[in-house]
Regions:
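Asp-based, Mg2+/Mn2+-dependent phosphohydrolase catalytic module
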Residues: 1-46, 55-79, 86-269
Length: 269
């Protein structure tokens, strides 16, 4: 197998995208090196985004939650699957209509994209994370899709963690709708590189000079690889070093935690 291109032959990284959970925070606590990594980005005037597939919270909510964890990340530096989904819809069919199942993070983003949320003949059915599942809403979504509405979902994650244990996530509910309609959704969030490319567009960055940091091979690293970024896997989240060989792609670098990347940030300037 060919070795990755030598670091000295690559252009410097001038923009960074980082996953949130398992990279910067874990169980509402900042991970070691997270503050120092963010400080290095700011000190070197490097544009960055913090990414999450969670579509429940608005960017303002997430910024406040991160502040409670000890991290200062303004809402304009946050890019959620809800933001990416709204940007995708705005690009595909500007000013159209959608039947939306989701929380404030998704509905706020859809409104900001100029969409009308409706229960009358929508062009799209858009599914995000929800805290409680409404049988009537799911039934309505199924009937709209059967009637020709296009099925969009924020992210393919089938489960997520909570203080009480595992919770069903967007992908699990999407599977139920698919079982009833025979229609597969188009997932916008990671592992789809669309979310990465839209984030790069937001900060005016190019893939060949950007890096993606994540703790999961199947979403973060895969999306980064497919979008053409240099990917860095950190072992502070859900992936162990021995898991990497189970995938047909590999990250540019593997690190114990986000603090190990500070040197790379500073070396670019």
């Amino acid at each position: 197998m060919n070795e990755p291109t030598a670091l000295s032959e690559l252009p410097p990284v001038t923009a960074w995208l980082s996953d949130m959970d398992g990279v910067l925070v874990k169980e509402n606590r900042a991970l070691p090196g997270a503050n120092e990594f963010l400080a290095a980005l700011r000190a070197n005037n490097i544009p960055f985004l913090v990414l999450t597939n969670n579509s429940v919270f608005t960017n303002r909510d997430l910024s406040a939650r991160l502040a409670n964890s000890g991290l200062d990340i303004p809402e304009e530096n946050i890019w959620t699957s809800a933001n990416a989904t709204a940007a995708f819809l705005q690009q595909q069919s500007p000013g159209s209509t959608a039947y939306v199942i989701g929380e404030a993070g998704l509905t706020t983003a859809i409104h900001a994209a100029g969409y009308v949320m409706t229960e009358t003949d929508p062009e799209f059915v858009v599914l995000g994370e929800v805290r409680s599942y409404d049988f009537r809403a799911l039934t309505q979504a199924i009937r709209f899709i059967e009637g020709g509405a296009k099925f969009i979902a924020t992210n393919p994650d089938v489960s997520g963690p909570s203080d009480e244990g595992t919770l069903p996530a967007c992908g699990a509910i999407a599977a139920m709708i698919t079982a009833a309609t025979g229609k597969q959704p188009y997932f916008v969030g990671k592992q789809n590189p669309v979310m990465i490319r839209a984030g790069l567009n937001k900060i005016g960055a190019h893939s060949e000079r950007a890096a993606m940091v994540g703790d999961r091979m199947d979403t973060d690293v895969r999306a980064g690889v497919e979008a053409g970024l240099r990917t860095h896997l950190v072992l502070s989240g859900s992936t162990a070093r021995e898991d990497v060989c189970n995938y047909p792609f590999r990250p540019f670098g593997i690190h114990e935690g986000i603090g190990d990347l500070i040197e790379l940030v500073e070396a670019a300037h």
